[in-house]
Amino acid sequence: GPLTILHINDVHAAFEQFNT
């Protein structure tokens, strides 16, 4: 996601998808 304070949330969401 964009380089923002919520960028951590974006990364977390991506990991959640990989974590099936």
From Swiss-Prot:
Tissue and organ expression note: Expressed by the venom gland.
Keyword Transmembrane helix: no
Molecular function per GO: hydrolase activity, acting on ester bonds; metal ion binding; nucleotide binding; toxin activity
Cellular localisation: Secreted
Transmembrane as UniProt keyword: no
Role of this protein: Toxin that shows cardiotoxicity on isolated guinea pig heart and auricle and neurotoxicity on isolated rat phrenic nerve diaphragm. Shows antiosteoporosis activity in experimental rats. Also induces apoptosis against human leukemic cells (U937 and K562). Has no effect on normal human lymphocytes. Apoptosis has been evidenced from damaged nuclei, cell cycle arrest at sub G1 phase, increase of early apoptotic cells, augmentation of DNA fragmentation and also a reduction of telomerase activity.
Protein name: Bengalin
Lineage of producing organism: Eukaryota, Metazoa, Ecdysozoa, Arthropoda, Chelicerata
